[in-house]
Amino acid sequence: MATENTPVRIGVLTSGGDAQGMNAAVRAVVRTALRLGAQPYAVMEGWAGAVAGGEGIRPLNWDSVGSILHRGGTIIGTARSKEFRTREGMLSAAANLLEHGIDRLVVIGGDGSLTGTNEFRKAWPSLLAELVETGRITPEVAAAHAQLMIAGLVGSIDNDLVGTDMTIGADSALHRIMEAIDSLSSTAASHQRTFVIEVMGRHCGYLALMSAVAGGCDYVFVPELPPADGWEEDMCNKLQAGRAAGRRDSLVIVAEGAQDREGNRITASDVCDVLEERLGEDARVTILGHVQRGGRPSAYDRWMSTLLGYAAAQEVLRATPESEPHIIGVRHNRIAHLPLMESVENTRAVASYVKAGDYEAAVEARGASFAQMLQIFENMSTPPVQGSHNEASPVKNKRVAILHAGGLAPGMNTAARAAVRLGIDHGLTMLGIEGGFPGLLDGAVKELSWADVEGWVGEGGAALGTHRDYPTIEQLYSIGRALESNHIDGLIVIGGFNAYLGAHTLIKERDRYPAFNIPIVCVPASIDNNLPGSELSIGADTAVNSTVSTLDAIKLSASASKRCFVAEVMGRRCGYLTLMSGLAAGAEKVYLPEHDANLNEIASATSDMVNSFRDGRRLYLVLRNEAACGLYSTKLLADIFAQESNGLYDVRESVIGHVQQGGNPTAFDRLMATRLVTNAMQVLVDELVAGTARGHYVGLVNGEFRDSPLAHMNDELDLVNRRPRDQWWLRLEHVIPVVSQDEVAIDKSKLPPL
C-alpha cells in the first residue's frame, strides 16, 4: 500500500482494439510520470489485468519502455474484458489497484473503453465502501484513495471520436491502406481491371474517404452518407466515364460499415456482383482486414502519441478529486482537453443521425474537413464528360498554368493533378510548365487534360520538373513575353522558398511589366516546412517518415554494441524535420538552427552522454540539422563525442541526405496537397471572375485555410534564415529531454504543459 512517503502511483493501460502508436503513448506516460516524481505501473492486458491482479499490474522503470517506439501493437497487451463489466469484476479491479496504491489512471482505447473507465470512476466510492465492508481493504486505505482520477487517450484506427482531429493509429492505418491501393492499382491497370477494396473503420468513413481521395479512386461508400436509391447505375456510369476518359483501372472503396438508406449493408461482394452483372467487369474483391492494424507506426503516430502521453501524464498528476475526466485529443496539431463523456456521447450520436436519415448532421459531426473531402472527391473523380455543367462557367477557357519551383517535395505530382482536374471542373484550360521558371523562359508549356494526370496522385518526384532558379531582373522581360505568347491568364506556383521569392518578384515588378498583372497563387511544397502562411508544407510529412525509417535502421545497426550515432538531417535553416524526426525516432539530443549550441552546451551534452553509457545505455542518438551549430559540423561533433568516450562506446556519423526528398508521398501529404490546391484554385477563380489580379499564398493555420497577400509575404519571414518568424512546432522542443534523457536534470515546476 502507498504511504505518505511514497510517490504518487499511476497506472497506464491499453484497452479494446490495438492501434499503432499505443507504444509511443505508453512510453511517454511512463517517462513523464517518472520525471515528475511519480511511480508508473502497467496494467497488463487491459482491464483483464486489473481484474486478475498479481502479475497483471507491474511497476515500470525508464528502461521498461525503451526501444518500443517503432513497434506496432501494444507491449502491455490489450483485451476486451467481460468480467470488468460486472460489479464483481469492478470490485476486484479496485482492490487490485489499491493494493499498489494506484488511484490515477491513463487509459488508451476507443469510446467503449473510455466509457467503461468513466463508469468505473463514478462507481469508485461505492466500490471502496463495499471493499471496506467486506474487509478487503481498510478504512484508512479507502480514505487515502477516495476518488479515482483518470485521463483518456483515444487509441483507434477508425478516427471516429468526435472532437479530436486524429486518433492514435489512424494515420498508420492509412499508410497500410495506401500501400495496398498503390500495389493494387498497378496490377489493375495492367489488366484494365476493377478492384473493390473493403477497409475498416466500423461506423466511421474516415479511412474509406481519405484513402479514396489519396488513392485516386473512382467511387467510395461511407456510412455517414448512404448512397441514394439507384446507386448501382450511378456507380456503373461513373466507372464507364472514367474508362472513356483514359483510366485503365477502376478502384472502388467500401467502408466496412457501409449501408444503403434502408439500413441494408453494402459489402464489397455486393459491389463486385453489380459490376460483373451490369458492366461485365472482371472485378476482384480485396478485404484488407487486420493488416490495417499492423506494422510499424507512422512518424505522426509516434510524435503525436508522444505528445499525447506527455500531456496525459501531466493531466492525471495534476488532477484533484473534483476534476472532471478529460480525453487528451488533437486539434490543429495542438493538444486539446475534451470532456470525456460529452465527446463519447457526440460520437455515438453520429449513428443515430444516420438511422434517422439526417445525413447532413452525420457528416457535419465528423468535422468540416470531412465534408470538404466528400465534395473534393466528387469533383476529382468525375471525368469532364460528366462535367458539362461548366459550359456556362464565367471563367471558361481561361488559361491557367501550373509551375513547380524550388527543391523537390513529395506530393508535387498530387498537387499538380489536383490543380488540373479541379481547374477543368471550373471550366479552365490547364497548362503545365516543365522545368520551373527556366522552363517558362524556354517556352516549355503544354496543355494538360484530365487523362494526362492519371496516375500522378501517388507518384513521388515531379512529372513537370522543378528548378531552384527564379527570375532575375534581367530575365523579367522574357518572362513577361512568355506569359503573353502562351496567353496565360493565371499562375499556380507549387514549391518552396524560391518559388515564393519568384512569385513575389513578379508581383513587385508589375508596374514595369504589365504581363505580370495576372492572378498568382503560391502553394507550399517543401520538405523544410519553412514557408510563410502555413504551419505545414506538402512533402514535410513524407520527409519525416523517410528520415524516421532511416533512423530505425541506424538504431538497429547500433543495438549490437555500445554506440553513439550522430545523424545529419536536411531542412536548411529550419529545424522542423530534425525536431519531429527526433521525437518520432526517440533521439536523445537534437541540434536545431533556431537555437545554435555553443561549446559549453556541447561539452555538457558530451558529459551527459558519457554518464549515460556508464549507467548502462547501449545507444545514444543525436540528430543535427544540416545548418545547426555553426562550425561544429556533424563530423566534428562525432569526433568530440568519440574523443571523450575513452573507449566506453564508439561513435558513428551518418548524413541521411536526399533520401529525405524521395519516395512516394504519404497519405497525409496527398490529402494536404489536395486540400491546399482546392483552396488555391478557388482563390484564383475568384480573382478571374472579379477581373482582379492580386497575388496570394495559401496555407493551413490552426486547422483553417488561410489566404494571404503575396505583396506582404516578407512581413512573416526571417529572410536571413529563410524561415517564418513564428514557428508553432518550437513549443514542442522541451518534450525530448523529458522522454529521452533521464540523465539530464529538469525543473519539474517549470515543465510547461502542451
Task: Give residue spans per PLM region.
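N-terminal phosphate-binding or glycine-rich loops at protein starts, especially the Walker A/P-loop
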Residues: 2-54, 394-441
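Glycine-rich oxoanion-binding loops at beta->alpha junctions
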Residues: 2-3, 50-103, 114, 140-142, ...
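Short glycine-rich or small-residue beta-strand-to-loop segments that form or flank ligand, phosphate
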Residues: 9-17, 74-79, 103-109, 152, ...
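Short, ordered loop/turn segments at secondary-structure junctions
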Residues: 15-18, 43-49, 80-81, 110-112, ...
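Short glycine/serine/threonine-rich phosphate/pyrophosphate-binding segments
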Residues: 19-29, 50-51, 85-91, 111-118, ...
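Accessory alpha-helical/coil subdomains and C-terminal extensions
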Residues: 40, 107-109, 115-149, 167-285, ...
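C-terminal non-catalytic interaction/assembly regions of soluble proteins
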Residues: 267-394, 636-754
